[in-house]
Amino acid sequence: MAGVSSCLKYSMFFFNFLFWVCGTLILGLAIWVRVSKDGKEIITSGDSSTNPFIAVNILIAVGSIIMVLGFLGCCGAVKESRCMLLLFFIGLLLILILQVAAGILGAAFKPEYNRILNETLYENAKLLSDNTDEAKDFQKAMIVFQSEFKCCGLENGAADWGNNFVEAKESCQCTGTDCATYQGSSVYPKTCLSLIKDLFEKNIIIVIGIAFGLAVIEILGLVFSMVLYCQIGSK
């Protein structure tokens, strides 16, 4: 009867440890985005009925599941447990299928995501010239955002602030040569809406890269777990 390959056994452990680390990173990043004060205020303010944190909550769940599967894979390899390895294989296969389905749906519904993002930000632009308590809270967050990212307004630049421009004037002030002029003041020519869209597009590329790398690890995990499962059964 053939024995269990030590090389395969510890390769399985190593790749599952990487898998567990990936789950930890996804969970940590998703939680950070979820509790980030400035980002939360900017994204969730407004009258949009769409919850922009649905995707973040899904990532928190996915990160937790990946951590559990990584643990099952590591323990199943070290303890040579066929039950743990089978649970790991089934769970990992389901995640890979869901990941591929999510990628296809994400590509198909990208225009819808852009529409939701535009609607949310356009609604928020109205808050800049408003005087309600909700608007004031959003304006404070926008002033911080403008100062940090060197942009002004959301849709129409400094004009979005209306009569509230005096309060936002300092955060919009441009000291370079490539500046726009509004009410006699030099302001940043770039709107925060265009900046947020640029950041969104760049982050999508990063997410795609992470998803591709994770898929490679998942496929290796499936192969190693099934081979190890068969070797343990033939002892």
Swiss-Prot record:
GO terms for cellular component: cell surface; plasma membrane. Disruption phenotype: Tspan8 deficiency results in a lower body weight in male mice fed a normal chow diet, and in a lower gain in body weight upon feeding a high fat high carbohydrate diet. No significant body weight differences could be detected for female knockout mice. In addition to the body weight and bone density phenotypes, male knockout mice also exhibit lower circulating levels of free fatty acids and glycerol. The keyword Glycoprotein applies. Glycans are attached at residue 118. InterPro entries: Tetraspanin/Peripherin, Tetraspanin_animals, Tetraspanin_CS, Tetraspanin_EC2_sf. Its main location: membrane. The keyword Hydrolase does not apply. The chain crosses the membrane at residues 13-33, 53-73, 85-105, 204-224. It is a multi-pass membrane protein. Disulfide bonds: none annotated. Residues 34-52, 106-203 are extracellular. It is found in: Cell membrane. GO terms for molecular function: integrin binding. Keywords: Cell membrane, Glycoprotein, Membrane, Transmembrane, Transmembrane helix. Residues 1-12, 74-84, 225-235 are cytoplasmic. Belongs to the tetraspanin (TM4SF) family. Forms homooligomers. Interacts with MEP1B. Interacts with integrin alpha3/ITGA3. Interacts with RICTOR and MTOR. Interacts with ADAM17. Interacts with ECE1. This is Tetraspanin-8. It comes from Mus musculus (Mouse).
